[in-house]
Design a protein with these regions (language model features):
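Arg/Lys-rich, alpha-helical DNA-contact motif
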Residues: 1-19, 31-40, 47-82
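Base-recognition residues in the alpha-helical recognition helix of bacterial helix-turn-helix
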Residues: 28
Length: 82
Protein backbone atom coordinates (compact mmCIF):
# COMPACT_ATOMS: atom_id res chain seq x y z
CA UNK A 1 0.00 0.00 0.00
CA UNK A 2 1.30 3.45 -0.88
CA UNK A 3 0.65 6.63 1.06
CA UNK A 4 -1.37 9.34 -0.63
CA UNK A 5 -0.60 12.77 0.81
CA UNK A 6 -3.03 14.90 -1.15
CA UNK A 7 -6.55 16.21 -1.10
CA UNK A 8 -6.63 15.94 -4.87
CA UNK A 9 -8.44 13.07 -6.57
CA UNK A 10 -6.38 10.15 -7.84
CA UNK A 11 -6.81 7.80 -10.79
CA UNK A 12 -8.22 4.30 -10.51
CA UNK A 13 -4.72 2.81 -10.85
CA UNK A 14 -3.36 4.92 -8.02
CA UNK A 15 -6.43 4.16 -5.90
CA UNK A 16 -5.97 0.42 -6.48
CA UNK A 17 -2.30 0.57 -5.55
CA UNK A 18 -2.93 2.75 -2.47
CA UNK A 19 -5.63 0.41 -1.15
CA UNK A 20 -3.93 -2.88 -2.06
CA UNK A 21 -6.75 -3.82 -4.42
CA UNK A 22 -6.89 -4.14 -8.21
CA UNK A 23 -8.36 -1.95 -10.92
CA UNK A 24 -10.62 -4.86 -11.87
CA UNK A 25 -11.86 -5.14 -8.28
CA UNK A 26 -12.65 -1.42 -8.05
CA UNK A 27 -14.55 -1.51 -11.36
CA UNK A 28 -16.57 -4.49 -10.09
CA UNK A 29 -17.40 -2.73 -6.82
CA UNK A 30 -18.54 0.26 -8.87
CA UNK A 31 -20.94 -1.92 -10.91
CA UNK A 32 -22.47 -3.08 -7.62
CA UNK A 33 -22.68 0.60 -6.49
CA UNK A 34 -20.54 -0.16 -3.43
CA UNK A 35 -18.31 2.76 -4.39
CA UNK A 36 -19.10 5.75 -6.58
CA UNK A 37 -16.03 7.52 -7.92
CA UNK A 38 -16.36 10.79 -9.76
CA UNK A 39 -16.64 10.16 -13.50
CA UNK A 40 -15.22 12.68 -15.97
CA UNK A 41 -15.56 12.31 -19.72
CA UNK A 42 -13.23 13.72 -22.34
CA UNK A 43 -14.62 12.99 -25.76
CA UNK A 44 -15.32 9.27 -25.88
CA UNK A 45 -12.99 8.48 -22.96
CA UNK A 46 -14.11 8.25 -19.37
CA UNK A 47 -11.97 8.66 -16.27
CA UNK A 48 -12.63 7.68 -12.67
CA UNK A 49 -11.33 9.85 -9.86
CA UNK A 50 -11.15 8.84 -6.21
CA UNK A 51 -10.97 11.33 -3.33
CA UNK A 52 -9.43 10.65 0.11
CA UNK A 53 -12.85 9.68 1.54
CA UNK A 54 -13.26 7.15 -1.30
CA UNK A 55 -9.83 5.71 -0.56
CA UNK A 56 -10.67 5.35 3.13
CA UNK A 57 -13.86 3.46 2.29
CA UNK A 58 -12.08 1.22 -0.22
CA UNK A 59 -9.35 0.45 2.29
CA UNK A 60 -11.91 -0.40 5.01
CA UNK A 61 -13.78 -2.71 2.64
CA UNK A 62 -10.54 -4.46 1.66
CA UNK A 63 -9.47 -4.79 5.31
CA UNK A 64 -12.78 -6.44 6.23
CA UNK A 65 -12.53 -8.81 3.27
CA UNK A 66 -9.00 -9.72 4.36
CA UNK A 67 -10.43 -10.53 7.81
CA UNK A 68 -12.76 -13.07 6.18
CA UNK A 69 -15.98 -11.11 5.74
CA UNK A 70 -18.01 -11.34 2.53
CA UNK A 71 -17.98 -8.37 0.19
CA UNK A 72 -21.54 -7.41 1.15
CA UNK A 73 -20.77 -7.60 4.87
CA UNK A 74 -17.54 -5.65 4.38
CA UNK A 75 -19.36 -2.87 2.54
CA UNK A 76 -22.07 -2.72 5.19
CA UNK A 77 -19.49 -2.52 7.98
CA UNK A 78 -17.42 0.11 6.13
CA UNK A 79 -20.56 2.21 5.66
CA UNK A 80 -21.40 1.85 9.37
CA UNK A 81 -17.90 3.04 10.33
CA UNK A 82 -18.57 6.56 9.05
Amino acid sequence: MIAINTDKPVSIGTAAEASNTTVKMLRYWETKVYITPERVYSGSRGYRFYYPADLQKITKIKDYIDQGYTLQAAVRMANDDK
